[in-house]
UniProtKB/Swiss-Prot annotation:
HAMAP family: ISPT. Its cofactor is Mg(2+). GO terms for molecular function: ditrans,polycis-polyprenyl diphosphate synthase [(2E,6E)-farnesyl diphosphate specific] activity; magnesium ion binding; Z-farnesyl diphosphate synthase activity. The lineage of its organism: Bacteria, Bacillati, Actinomycetota, Actinomycetes, Mycobacteriales. Substrate binds at residues 44-48, 61, 89-91, 95, 214, 220-222. One of its GO terms (biological process) is polyprenol biosynthetic process. The keyword Metal-binding applies. This is Isoprenyl transferase 1. Keywords: Magnesium, Metal-binding, Transferase. It comes from the Bacteria. Mg(2+) binds at residues 43, 233. GO terms for cellular component: plasma membrane. Its EC number is 2.5.1.-.
Amino acid sequence: MRTLKKFSLRDLAYNAAYPFYEKRLMREIQGVRQPEHVAIMCDGNRRWAREAGFADVTHGHRVGAKKIGEMVRWCAHTDVELVTVYLLSTENLGRASDELQMLFDIIGDVVDELASPETNCRLRLVGHLDLLPDDVSRRLTQAQDSTNDNTGVFVNVAVGYGGRQEIVDAVRELIDAEAAAGTTATEMAEKISVDSISKHLYTSGQPDPDLVIRTSGEQRLSGFLLWQAAYSEIWFTDTYWPAFRRVDFLRALREYSKRSRRFGK
């Protein structure tokens, strides 16, 4: 009984202090350098569900899905112009069929929410959509196309995405384009460069991420934006994605503002 009372008081104190901490963080990032492009690795959904005591770990994916719309709104409120959200890797496609179907349904709901008029996002799907079931691919593409005239935050949705595969696809597309133009093999080799490959990435025409955030305590990129994140600042947090809060995001922005970006120099 004492433990319960102690926890309850602590919880009340935390809830009372939270708004003040959030306001303090907002003050600390006012007028300082902020990222234009933030990339998010939404990791830890299943672990969060297990540790929270849910028998059905898919509950973690559902709670995590609701967090994505919140995250996009946080970005809009802090003048982040572009967000890339990593939802499904090519490796994830090897999971059990029942779990995959559940993930496809959740991702479809997330994309539909982001495509809603209220959100006003401009969506871009990045990844191998041809690896997805036809109905899933159609649903995502229709949602993407419906946002063409929106004026809000740009949101890249990485689905069926693999960083190595993206680079391979970019090089192949470059070679195909040059071959179609009658370029010889020798001329083609001379035209392959960082800039020419960048123009054929899934994210072509967009700035590279300034800040990559990964939740759940894992400290690796796991194939996410391997080319684009070469000089990104990376911020890791032990917090699982479903438990990720606005103060966590603001802490990441504060940390970013304190770092000196050298771009390999």
